[in-house]
Amino acid sequence: VSLLEAFEPVAHDLRAAGLDCQLAEDPNPGEPAAGATAVLIVSGVKVGRLTLGASVLDTASRTLYLAAQTQRLVQGNLSIGGRVIEWPPCLPSHAHPMMATRGQRAPLWTCPLGGEVSVPIGQHP
């Protein structure tokens, strides 16, 4: 599974939150043996580089790895009106984002307060 294919569930969840996203070719990709890279652009802002190591083989692990990277890049490098983007949002009563975790069958976005609330990555409302 390519970086683009593994990223598609993450892209769905960005779009569900009203954030436009695209991957652009990395102008400095480095050694091909190190894995695939792409530049992540969210709402018109280049937020950073995604990397997918060659050793990350299964689709669920690839998606989980990209989701965690994307979350760090969005929270660290994107703000709207001076406000940090808490993505992906948790319950409306929670003032924090969900976190990427490994589920039994699929990668999940999970509430960091106990983990009782979760949704598969790619199905965030």
Q: What name fits each language-model region?
A:
Residues V1-Y65:
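Long, charged N-terminal interaction/targeting segments
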Residues A54-P125:
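Cys/His-clustered metal-coordination modules, chiefly Zn-binding fingers
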